[in-house]
């Protein structure tokens, strides 16, 4: 294998408050560990992970998983959501005119509850305000090459997101040139 391209909307362990006796499969750490092991076993393997800024709460709660992947030499790209159409146009206009320039870069100590986690985690006002745009890259795909040099991949409804671990999902496996347009759209 020469390369692996992954594009997932949700790649995190944030799951909100759990009811007594409730648990989730740790999908995000399982995938993180598998990618790190693969990169360590084959250092020349080029791995690209494209994911959404929601995974670090729009900068308000940086993802340790994404940081570990970057530290191992895996390319991690956060989708530039500003390039997407507004899904909440009334708010998004207000965001650009009155909040975006004023709210800083979103780093620093947070004081608002993390909307995605039930624990003590806190995020900045900017993180909350940016999330209200409701923009997201909902793609879920994996493309790589096999030992014969053929393109192989899946397009799925699943996310490596702990709180999504109990969801029912579907996927289609593809092979060959049918994956070229998807691959070209990712790189």
Give residue ranges: language-model regions:
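HKD-type phospholipase D/PLD-like phosphodiesterase module
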Residues: 1, 10-187
């Amino acid at each position: 294998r020469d390369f692996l391209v992954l594009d997932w909307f949700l790649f995190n362990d944030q799951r909100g408050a759990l009811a007594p006796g409730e648990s989730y499969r740790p999908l995000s750490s399982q995938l993180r560990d598998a990618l790190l092991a693969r990169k360590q076993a084959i250092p020349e393997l080029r791995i690209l992970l494209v994911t959404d800024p929601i995974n670090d709460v729009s900068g308000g709660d940086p993802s340790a998983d994404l940081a570990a992947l970057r530290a191992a030499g895996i390319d991690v790209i956060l989708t530039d959501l500003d390039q997407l159409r507004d899904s909440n146009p009334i708010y998004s206009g207000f965001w650009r005119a009155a909040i975006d320039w004023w709210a800083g870069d979103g780093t620093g100590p947070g004081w608002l509850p993390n909307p995605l986690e039930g624990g003590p985690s806190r995020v900045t006002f900017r993180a909350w305000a940016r999330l209200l745009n409701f923009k997201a890259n909902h793609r879920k795909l994996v493309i790589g090459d096999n030992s014969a040099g053929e393109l192989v991949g899946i397009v799925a409804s699943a996310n490596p997101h702990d709180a999504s671990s109990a969801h029912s999902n579907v996927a289609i496996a593809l092979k060959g040139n049918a994956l070229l347009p998807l691959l070209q759209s990712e790189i």
